[in-house]
Amino acid sequence: MTKKYINILKAFAFACCLSGTVSCQDDFLERTPDGKYTGESFYASDEAVLKACEPLYNRAWFNYNRRSMLGLGSLRANDGWNLYMNAEFARFQITALTGEIMQAWSSLHTVVTMSNAILHDVSENTGPDVSIEVKNQAIGEAYLMRGVAYFYMLRIWGPCILFENNDEVVLNPTRPLNPEEDVLKFVIRDFRRASEYLPEKGINGHASCYAAKALLAKALLAQSGWNKGGTRDEDILDECISLCEEVIDKSGASLIDYENLFKYQYNNNEETLLAMKWASPVTGSWGETNALLSDLSFSDVCDVNCWGGSWVASADMIELYNQELKDKKRLKATFFTYDTHYDYIKSASGGYTYDKKWIQVKKGVVGCKEDVDGQLAVMASPLNTYIIRLADVYLTHAEASLGNQARLSGGRGLECFNAIRTRAGIDPKTSITFEDIIRERRVEFCMEYCNWYDMVSWYRYRPDFMLDYFNHRQHRNAFIDNNNVEINPDGSIRYHFWWRDANENIYWSDALRDEDGNVVQSIADGYVFDLESLMRENGVDRITINESNVFAPYPEADVLQNPYLSMDPVPYDFGNDK
């Protein structure tokens, strides 16, 4: 038995143990599963079926959520970065041996294999007391989560290995890649099926059909322009818009206060359409809690062991906030800035006021034990991880409405765009462009582990535009250190690195200043903060993004055991689903 074969069996075993479809004996890996499931007795009741689906909301995602998604979804987008942790993601230096790449690959395939197992067992191995409503809920959830996993994989790796039958993979684990367009078609088919099976209101907090329709709209938006030469398919856009309006008008979801979105007390809030739901460290076990806590938090704001104090905003992100000086609600919820007060952190002592001249990451930081009813431990918080929330649907509508136009000047798409801005406390726009969409999405979802995925979809839609954006406008590889960030009287953020001119004056982003902070030359007097030139002059390597590194490498262990991962993809057999 090859190592690859054992790895496939391990993934299969883990998924099946989570869903309860097979016995979790230590000797499972010593033999090929014989296909005899215990599902008949396990799925004897509605409660048993729903219980079997619960790991699809946490355990199956654990290794992806643990650290991989931070690097893949946020650091590659240049939301922020950490010079000392996962910097290879921000620098586009990940390799086939990068641990987080292997964890993401394993975790996302676990979601797929577990979903496949549930689809099989709920269809074949349920007792007479299981209701059709619960069967449909479980089948819909399995399609939904499998679609989510493949949607992530598509935008991480490009071509993927599609499979629907776990037994076939066990018998033949060496399988070819399938092309991006087929993966996207598969994702859309899964979301469409999920929307047909899931109820309008999920049972006991499980997913509803509107979660599936929201994700279907998002996948269709990606498909509308994917490798289509810079244009979007209008028919696909029309369906996308229709789905968005259905979710907005009928789901019952609503936009809530932005800062509350990232407090554990507001888990499962009215804006949530689908999320990874993490257990309390008090009652949950390893694999069921949100392990990102210790990576993101630091000792000033957390009383459990943590090591995340060096996560900071990128210069690129700071400039996006400076474009809209009223955008303080989202800034406060996303990054700590000088003299900002948080009454819900260290709440027992009157709150916490950030006193550093820096810009550390705030999202994912929930405070101390006293702030979360004691539900905190090392690498363990109960804060949900959003997969999709209603704001995403609003901006999907806006982008689809813009479509192939250079500018959108009215209609419901513009209203949706402005609804997000109104919630943020900034002025509505009378018209929007593609660049407005990019800016709004990046700020709205900054440090929510998803911005890079939208950038990949945009890259497949408008590759030349996005390569220029990546390589000439994002100022990658420039780390802003402590004491190098200040707030101007008008609310804008100024920052600098350690670079000085011949007279020891410091190149700040808003002016040339002496060591005491006095302005030597202002922008009005001709000062230009040319960050790209300063980086080159001071030995900061340029990060070049192109077709060869937009997508991540496949894990080396899998490449060595599966030669197909080094070959061209082959079309997927969709059978009668043409």
Language model features by range: what are they?
Residues 1-34, 454-457:
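Bacterial Sec-dependent N-terminal signal peptides
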Residues 24, 108-109, 186, 264-299, ...:
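Long, intrinsically disordered, low-complexity segments
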Residues 24-86, 184, 188, 192-193, ...:
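An aromatic- and glycine-enriched ligand-binding surface/loop that stacks and positions planar moieties
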Residues 45-64, 84-157, 173, 177-185, ...:
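Conserved, well-structured interaction surfaces
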Residues 154-156, 161, 202, 222-231, ...:
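Short coil/turn linking the two alpha-helices of tandem helical-hairpin repeats
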Residues 322-389, 571-578:
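Flexible, polar/acidic helix-loop-strand segments at domain edges
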